[in-house]
Amino acid sequence: MLDERAKLLLKALIERYIADGQPVGSRTLSRASGLELSPATIRNVMADLEDLGLIISPHTSAGRIPTARGYRLFVDTMLTADRADIVTPELVPEQPQKVIANAANLLSSLSQFVGVVLVPRRTSVFKHIEFVRLSERRFLVIIVSPDGDVQNRVIFTDVDYSSSQLIEASNFLNSHYAGLAMEEVRERLKGEVELLRGEVATLMQAAVNIGTEAMTSAQEDVVIAGERNLLSVSDFSSDMGNLRRAFDLFEQKTQILRLLDFSSQAEGVRIYIGGESQVVPFEELSVVSAPYELDGKVVGTLGVIGPTRMHYDRMIQIVDITSKLVSNALSHKR
């Protein structure tokens, strides 16, 4: 258990290191802490903090830097609640894919690190379907999902359907099957085609087949923006090995997906420092994440990935604000 003096010195050391990235010596720490302590006393406290695994001494310097364990104690017990001056533009309610992409870019821009957003799992349930004639025997099928996602597909037919036939087909599908998964609609249609004229039934079956493919097709599971920002972070630009590992992590995405998926089960902002998540075993990276919602239900997670030497208070606010913006934008796109 740390006494108050040790806590103040650890807090001052971490804040100083976050600010300039240089190992902190006893003289610098004496000035930064504001405590009237002799350099010898400060060195003794720093030795105790090192024994506890909260700070370490790089071999190239007599100063100290925080460990992941030190950052964790700092984040859990020492962060101030001062509101940072963060100017965030509104995310305009529009198609979910655009909201997600804009959110990743916003996170990256505000943090100057990497913004990541876990994409909601696409559903094959449809809310509305409509047909538009493009030319002879060529039609546009417009499929709207319950979350406002719009899929447009062009189909070619052997029959040149009239406007009344297109309306008949869309009305039947919307009145009988809206709210069902496309796979279920396809099965039900097989037993109900005799209720409709043959040509219209064929059109509906073609629309449902292409709709099933469109709404369950492979999609990007996670959107990542700002990877190149790490090139400007001294913690990475000076170590090509770490930089290469970080870019491999972003390219493969698997570990990021697992971490964001796990984070969606938590309420509020979560912070993973270094390798403590055991999902992204990277001692030099930290992840600040938060879930976002659609109509009050958690549908995904977003966050910032950057060096362990980050302004955690600012990152927490950026992630928290962005999760609220995304939730509002998605829920208002109804």
From Swiss-Prot:
The keyword Repressor applies. Keywords: Repressor, Stress response, Transcription, Transcription regulation. Pfam families: HrcA, HrcA_DNA-bdg. GO terms for biological process: negative regulation of DNA-templated transcription. GO terms for molecular function: DNA binding. The keyword Transmembrane does not apply. PANTHER family: HEAT-INDUCIBLE TRANSCRIPTION REPRESSOR HRCA. Belongs to the HrcA family. Negative regulator of class I heat shock genes (grpE-dnaK-dnaJ and groELS operons). Prevents heat-shock induction of these operons. This is Heat-inducible transcription repressor HrcA. It comes from Delftia acidovorans (strain DSM 14801 / SPH-1). The gene is hrcA.
